[in-house]
Amino acid sequence: MKIVLQHLTKKFPARSSVRGRKNREDVIAVNDFDFEIPDGKLIGLLGPSGCGKSTALNLICGLLKPTEGKIFFGEDDVTGLPPENRGVGMVFQNYALYPHLTVEKNIQFPLENLKGADKLSKEEMSKRVLEAAKLVQIDHLLERKPNELSGGQQQRVAIARALVKLPRVLLLDEPLSNLD
């Protein structure tokens, strides 16, 4: 499924100082961005720190709302859809793992709150978790906690967690950092 971004813009308002005066102007993180990703293609966004790469990913997955513009998955306008209804898996730069949960439970976490027809049995959840863990070669680490893993292993947990819901779109922010 192709992804199309049309005139995508994200502005963050200026922050006020303690005395109520503005200490800077509005920040335009993404400005009139037009882009098309063909179906089945893997692409990378390259640019210097602060140029809007992560903001663009957060707009695509729905964690941020665009100031202007549209986002299409195939023919569907997903601009107004909440993140949970977009079918996007997101791997964040900082992994966002739950330190008190095992690797298995971290991967399983997004499956726990599925509702209605999407709700899975415990057996199906376990099967999906094992498949995702095998895919990223961490199936031997399922009983460990995140603090027992290397940075690369933690990133693999985050990737497996994003894959376990079988997303239509997979977004990775800084995907090669810490991989071993």
Task: List the predicted regions and their residue ranges.
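A short, proline-enriched helix->beta-strand linker immediately N-terminal to the Walker B motif
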Residues: 164-168
